[in-house]
Amino acid sequence: QFRPSYQIPP
């Protein structure tokens, strides 16, 4: 399974 890494804003 491909799990995309999202950039979470601070």
From Swiss-Prot:
It is found in: Secreted. GO terms for molecular function: toxin activity. GO terms for biological process: regulation of blood pressure. It comes from the Eukaryota. One of its GO terms (cellular component) is extracellular region. Expressed by the skin glands. The modification Pyrrolidone carboxylic acid is found at residue 1. Keywords: Hypotensive agent, Pyrrolidone carboxylic acid, Secreted, Toxin. Belongs to the bradykinin-potentiating peptide family. This peptide both inhibits the activity of the angiotensin-converting enzyme and enhances the action of bradykinin by inhibiting the peptidases that inactivate it. It acts as an indirect hypotensive agent. This is Bradykinin-potentiating peptide Phypo Xa.
